[in-house]
Amino acid sequence: MSDRPAARPWGKCGSLCRREEIMVAFKGVWTQAFWKAVTAEFLAMLIFVLLSLGSTINWGGKENPLPVDMVLISLCFGLSIATMVQCFGHISGGHINPAVTVAMVCTRKISIAKSVFYIAAQCLGAIIGAGILYLVTPPSVVGGLGVTTVHGNLTAGHGLLVELIITFQLVFTIFASCDSKRTDVTGSIALAIGFSVAIGHLFAINYTGASMNPARSFGPAVIMGNWENHWIYWVGPIIGAVLAGGLYEYVFCPDVELKRRFKEAFSKAAQQTKGSYMEVEDNRSQVETEDLILKPGLVHVIDIDRGDEKKGKDPSGEIAQTQH
């Protein structure tokens, strides 16, 4: 006899089921529209990083540095993202931010498979955009290439909280501006998002560099090899984005149909936890009665005529008392 274990009869079926699950998860990935969207995210991030990081270059160099113009930097970042959203929003949704993409996954607006490609394209675009800026900028003034760093007088925890807050306000603005259920939004959605980015920069440039976008921090970090506290610019924005998306989508402005389906699901779950009851015959006595026994749990013998409850035995055979 062979020592080789016998193959399970459902082995092929299980393998087939797994393949089908993968195909369902990646449904829509192998389409022309999908790859256009991924390319749009890549190109939008490349242009955004190239233009916005260019505003952080100090052309005075290390010897004669010019004063940092926070208004210039804030407006450049805000107007750049607004322009990219206006240009590519109808193609890919205009995420241009891994934190926004994660928030969209958590609110079931895009699939996990799609988000993986989006985030990869965003990070690649950020690297290439930062690389192009590095190549076209004189070495004497390139400086840190806009790498985001936490202020020296702040701890990593402070930086994390600041990034969480400014990303929260950005993503909440995105969800509120793009809500298809609203009829009162008459202005430019792209401009509203751009203003939100600008506000975040005006507040937080001196604190953390005001990233709000993991890919924006990832690109220059790769080019310059500076990874100090880099994790803050992933964890903070993603937590802030998920909180903002979840609060808007499920608390402040929930979808009526989604709310109804959630309520039905919770109702069914509650009914299942109560247990199922069935009418059975009482074989403990030779006297014919109209007693009703309820199972599972303690066995209750209820006299229907008198409306009171007699002592019964639980399934283990011990006398049981039920209090109401």
Curated annotation (Swiss-Prot):
Family annotation (CDD domains): MIP (cd00333)
Motif (NPA 1): 97-99
Record keywords: Cell membrane, Cell projection, Endosome, Glycoprotein, Lipoprotein, Membrane, Palmitate, Phosphoprotein, Repeat, Transmembrane, Transmembrane helix, Transport
Residue positions where Phosphothreonine is found in the record: T289
Annotated region (Disordered), positions in chain: 305-324
Intramembrane bits: 94-101, 209-222
Motif NPA 2, chain ranges: 213-215
Cytoplasmic side: 1-36, 90-93, 102-115, 177-184, 253-324
Catalytic activity entry: H2O(in) = H2O(out)
Membrane-related topology note: Multi-pass membrane protein
Glycosylated residues, chain numbering: N153, N206
Extracellular side: 58-69, 137-155, 206-208, 223-231
Phosphoserine sites (modified residues): S111, S180, S276, S285
Family statement drawn from the similarity comment of this UniProt entry: Belongs to the MIP/aquaporin (TC 1.A.8) family.
Domain notes: Aquaporins contain two tandem repeats each containing three membrane-spanning domains and a pore-forming loop with the signature motif Asn-Pro-Ala (NPA).
Protein name: Aquaporin-4
The organism of origin for this protein: Dipodomys merriami (Merriam's kangaroo rat)
